[in-house]
């Protein structure tokens, strides 16, 4: 069974907690993965990373932000099937729902 760990500040890592929550397949009800639960320190780390990212992003001029967002949109569209598979796996959604 696959374990899903954390992604904070641009890096994935295995957290310190030994606690996990099951992710269920919505079609069968079976457990398809486990997501690691964060410690208080890891939540604080995620909040700090988000605050640091916001500082840089909020000071970026609107034209640059628009270019970044359009490139993000292009990448999402180009990788829609793979992203839908990942989202379905991580959240227990059916593929059609993951695609929106």
What do the PLM-derived regions correspond to, one by one?
Residues 32-100:
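Glycine-rich loop-to-alpha-helix module at the N-terminal edge of alpha/beta enzyme cores
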Residues 1-34, 67, 71:
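Terminal low-complexity tails and localization/encapsulation signals of metabolic enzymes
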